[in-house]
């Protein structure tokens, strides 16, 4: 199924900072699951395994693996990822910053904390897109939650370690 991004999607993304695009990458889910399985079996040296007394299962985070995991590379270069990003940003070109993989076991009890992606990155700018593609169903209590308009707040949300809630930066006053 090929889904075309429409003007309403673009307007929602630009006004709200978020848009749900159901089914856009549905034909890629099986490929991405194979890549995720490969990633879990052989995490990179950048991988983080989060531990917390409330976590009941594995919580693995890994990134920048698209060169090592062929399924990720295939998705990045052969799906509509770039054209979808380009449409949403109203841009003639896009650049890949990185891939980011989160693996939470089904009953891990690991909620996704409130956050914005930009404070974690070593880049700045307004024309950025992050795609969240769930490969399996999860309980709502541990799923990603989005706050429309948060990209227009006066301060960014303080970036923290997801396991310890410790700030990434010393200057916490710069953040909410």
Model-predicted regions and their roles:
Residues 38, 130, 163:
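Glycine-rich, phosphate-binding/catalytic loops in enzymes
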Residues 100, 116, 133-137, 146-148:
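Short, structured patches in soluble enzyme cores that scaffold and shape functional sites
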Residues 23-24, 106, 135-139, 150-151:
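Short loop segments at secondary-structure junctions
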Residues 1-16, 20-114, 120-122, 159:
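Non-heme Fe(II)-dependent double-stranded beta-helix
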Residues 139-176:
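Double-stranded beta-helix
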Residues 122-139:
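Short, conserved beta-strand element in jelly-roll/cupin
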Residues 82, 117, 128-132:
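Hydrophobic, well-ordered secondary-structure segments
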